[in-house]
């Protein structure tokens, strides 16, 4: 029986993953600051990106440098936003949001991932209509359902979803109201375990067996691309996809 990865190898892999997460968030901060100004209090999108950085222990100095590069106070790289849409095996719809300084490279990488995993890229709008853009505040199992529901309604949330299998709770908002609802919930003593603006599918497609493995391979491959910020799908993967 062979030995597993050494402690040093595991640490290096963890550091590489952390570095990739930091790179993606720094790009997101930069694009948000360039588009709406460098003050998070007056730029909701920047506020969300900064909060995302702080949640993974990104230092305030790193965040500040990213903002200054975007606003021209420091020299930096310009990134553009691109969205690709397509289908994974089994008719699963996929949205891929990218930030890139080289559109040709990015589209080639994304197309390669779709092709390699049995999917295909579509045209703009080919799958986006199957999703809604939402703000989601997630609370782990054990959270006080009654108190969170009351606070969410008071804060102006659009919906509260309680998952019966484990009791976890999602508070759903519009993208525009996301920051205000998040702040109001926190002020009431309910800090979400995870908070993001995301796409959610109107209806999920359950995939199992070999198809589920192919879909997961594609989603993982896309998420590993340096230029890809977020990947969304309407797949409900069976347990065998994680075997």
From Swiss-Prot:
One of its GO terms (biological process) is regulation of DNA-templated transcription. Coiled coil: none annotated. InterPro entries: Integrase-like_N, TACO1_YebC-like_2nd/3rd_dom, TACO1_YebC_N, Transcrip_reg_TACO1-like, Transcrip_reg_TACO1-like_dom3, YebC-like. One of its GO terms (cellular component) is cytosol. Keywords: Cytoplasm, DNA-binding, Transcription, Transcription regulation. SUPFAM superfamilies: YebC-like (SSF75625). Belongs to the TACO1 family. This is Probable transcriptional regulatory protein Smlt3713. It comes from Stenotrophomonas maltophilia (strain K279a).
